[in-house]
Structures are given as C-alpha cells and as structure tokens.
Amino acid sequence: MKRKAAALFGALCLVTLAACGGSDDTATEEVTEETTAPEESTSEVASLAGVCPDTITFQTDWNPESEHGFLYNMVGEGYEVDAAGLRVTGALVSKGQDTGVKIQVRAGGPAVGFTSPTSLMYSDPEIFLAFVSTDGAVQDSGEFPTMTVVAPFNINPQIIMWDPATYPNVKTIADLKATGAKVRYFGGAAYMEYFTATGILDSKQVDGNYDGTPANFVADGGKAAQQGFATSEPYYYQNVLTDWAKPVAYQTIHEAGWTAYAQSLGGKPDVVEANKDCLKLLVPMIQQSQVDYVTDPARANAVILDLVGQYNNGWLYDAGQAAAAVELGLSNGLIANSPDGTLGSFDLERVE
C-alpha cells in the first residue's frame, strides 16, 4: 500500500480554491487565492491557533467510515466522544503534531436523518466545512451557496452495481438499459437525471426509493441493480453480507459520464472569505492527511472503529471493511492526483 501511495502522491504542490455557487447555470468560478501543500519533512507544522476557529468542525455525509479517514486521521490522541451527538472532538494534528486548535468531526447520513451536510451547515454556524458534491453545490446554489476548497477524492466513488451472474453481458451502466433491470438509487440524485436525459438509462427503469440497505437487492436475487460506493459495497456484499456472499459487478458514475466531484469539503462563501488565512494553512494539512492516511491507515481506522462502537446507532462496520475501502480507493483510482499533479485540486473543466 505504501508503494501505491508513494507513486500516486509523489508531489503535493498547489491547490486553487474552487467556488460552487452563483447566478449562472454552471455556478462555478475560481478563487484566486492559492494554498501551498506542505513539503514532506519532519519539521514543525504550522500553528492554526489565532488564525482558525478554536474548534474546526467538519460535517460528514455518513457514519464513521474509511472514506472519511483523512478527517479522523487529524483527530489527536485523548479525543472526546459525544455518543448521543454522534461526534468526536480532539486536538487537530498534522503529521502527528498538535496545531493548537481542536477538530470536531460529526457523523451524517442516517445519523442525522439524511439531512444534507449543506443544510446542516446553514442551520448550525459552528460547522466550518462540510461534505459538498459539486453537482449538489450547483443544485443548491440558489438557496444554499457553497464554496468547495479541497477534493480528497479525485474520482467520485459512487457506482451502479449489478449481479454479474444474472447479467453476464452487462459491462457498463449503459448496458443495463437493454435489460430493463430496475435501478435503485437515492431519489433526487443529479447523476440519475443526467443518465435518463441522455438515454444512458430509461426513466421507466430507475427507482428513487433506495433506502441504503441491501435487503431489496438480496430479495430480488440480483434482478435489480442499485447504487453504491466503489470503496464499500463490492467488499461488503462479497465478504460480509452472508445473505449474498458473492461478487458484484459495477461501474463508477464517473466512467459513465457524470464527472462531478463528490465528498469535497466546502463552506459558506462568507465563512470561506473570512477565513482565507486559515484555509491557506488548513487545506494543505487536509491534503497531507489524505496522503498519510492511505499510506498508513491503521491508527485512523482504529479511531473510526472505536466511534462505530461507541455511537452504537445501528451502523455495522468492521476492520476488514475499513482496510478494504483504502485499497479499493487506490486500486480504482478514486484517491489520486488531479491532472495538474496535485492531490485535492479541482479540474475546473469538470465542474463547468
């Protein structure tokens, strides 16, 4: 794994803050401020004290999982867990060193009744940055404009998956159209509107009632396809879900033509503007944390599993899933440098 990470992330350099929100159709512009990622060294990390909020709060989009590992990797030892509030608070560390402020990471998705991170951020001023997809940012730009500042995932891990035994000739999402198979997804997803509008899938075959559980997929015996994450479901369905216990086939929605960024970190425009000096220091730390995490995920995964146990909210997640998510993120090219050679930067052609 360390060799994979070194090959992918040999050069951390510049990141340009990209804005999602505005009055035009694309709702995308470029912020001129640049941030410089830290050089690999053992030198003392920059202090965030007095530059950033005393506690930097991140709102995620799901329960604790490896896809959020770069955040949990920044939570220092001796962290405090609020099991009722489904959040963890600790010293914000970079390369193991205390930065002088605290970090709080909040669970999302089913933990918050599926309220979007953007909505939560607008209702709670304590949230500094939240998970924002660039397509969602465009959709919400009228009511809830956001500015995305870093993209830990270069490729959206969202997939459509199917049973290869039931559909041996299906190799892509587009191939599902001819089969007429039902395709379940979370209703309102912009990518599905794109798939049906462009004829990749038939509007009659898509079903927006996916509930995030495997029950219907298993009950259908593989006759229906459904959404998932390339870093999660392929491993889970084959190795953990005893009611299925066999491989699934899949394609990322990115490969099928929907190239928006997912799980980027963004904030309210006024907050981003007011905290430019903070972000110049913080964004490179986030970049570095993603590199450090995929190079050696053991400690952060231990934090994730500890939180899963303490939250005890019905979310089932084990060490095998946590480790597999990192491997799948790397092997599928989801965690990778942008075309400019930078981890975490935005290719603006993808969000226009």
Model regions and ranges:
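Bacterial N-terminal signal peptides that target proteins for export
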Residues: 1-9
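Bacterial lipoprotein signal-peptidase II cleavage site
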Residues: 20-31
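Short, glycine-/small- and polar/acidic-enriched structural segments
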Residues: 44-210, 217, 224
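Short, solvent-exposed loop/beta-turn-alpha elements that line the ligand-binding surface or hinge
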Residues: 80-98, 168, 250-258, 273, ...
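Secondary-structure end/capping motifs
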Residues: 275-352
